[in-house]
Curated annotation (Swiss-Prot):
Signal sequence, renumbered to the chain: none
Keywords tagged on the record: Ribonucleoprotein, Ribosomal protein
Organism expressing this protein natively: Dictyoglomus thermophilum (strain ATCC 35947 / DSM 3960 / H-6-12)
Protein family according to the UniProt entry: Belongs to the universal ribosomal protein uS2 family.
An example molecular function term from Gene Ontology annotations: structural constituent of ribosome
Pfam family, one: Ribosomal_S2
Protein name: Small ribosomal subunit protein uS2
Length: 246
């Protein structure tokens, strides 16, 4: 993993958990202490878990797997979009619709419909319609783009989910677990880490904390993709060499 220092975690406030009265007892092993009614997360354990999640994401990307980043809380929306785009992942950062995974066929048809409406609009079709009908289609398109913009081009269920605040995104967690899709997630002190395949103990409310951890997962995906490309290049060179020999 690209070197990350304890100092970076501290500066980003990754160690600040929730109020002690809001904790999940299953997070006990990741809690270092309590200060002024707030749980303090053990950053040594955060580093270990972040390393595990990084290696998993890297290996999955190396195998050509697809990722879906999920984070609809205000503090996460911008980071989720930026980091997903940077590493070529799909993303949901506005609203998780029930069935996005478990009813994927219907969701895919809505995404296709959004793309079709955009094509019609860009080709000037809306301008030929009565104003009332054109306005209705424009409003419908705006709603579709808001929800599905980060899922353009998705053809099948994602292979891995990365989630900011799995307690808030509990429907996404349930759907992924039902389908056996592995989850990487930032788990704050109020979350159940047993629902997550690769939990990363950390502050899921502070923008800097979300940005730091999310960027590391994106880095892992990019590193895995780079390794995949290099292996493909080596294979091509070997095939060329074999054909020359024969």
């Amino acid at each position: 993993m690209a070197h990350i220092l304890m100092k970076q975690l501290l500066e980003a406030g990754v160690h600040f958990g929730h109020q002690t009265k809001r904790w999940c007892p299953k997070m006990k092993e990741y809690i270092f202490s309590e200060r002024n009614g707030i749980h303090i997360i053990d950053l040594q354990k955060t580093l270990v878990k972040l390393e595990e999640a990084y290696e998993f994401a890297k290996e999955q990307a190396k195998e050509g797997k697809t990722f879906l980043f999920v984070g609809t809380k205000k503090q996460a929306q911008q980071t989720i979009e930026e980091e997903a785009k940077r590493c070529g992942a799909f993303y949901v950062n506005q609203r998780w619709l029930g069935g996005m995974l478990t009813n994927f066929t219907t969701i895919k048809s809505r995404i296709d419909y959004m793309v079709k409406l955009e094509e019609l609009k860009n080709n000037g079709y809306f301008e030929k319609l009565p104003k009332k009908q054109a306005n209705r289609l424009n409003r419908e398109l705006e709603k579709l783009v808001k929800v599905f913009d980060g899922l353009r081009g998705i053809e099948k269920l994602p292979d891995v989910l990365y989630i900011v605040d799995p307690k808030r995104e509990e429907i996404a967690v349930k759907e992924a677990n039902k389908l056996g899709i592995p989850i990487i997630a930032i788990v704050d002190t109020n979350c159940d880490p047993e629902l997550i395949t690769y939990p990363i103990p950390g502050n899921d409310d502070a923008i800097r904390s979300i940005k730091l951890i999310t960027s590391k997962i994106a880095d892992a995906i990019l590193e895995g993709k780079d390794l995949r490309e290099k292996e493909a290049d080596l294979q091509l060179k070997d095939e060329d060499l074999q054909s020359e020999i024969s």
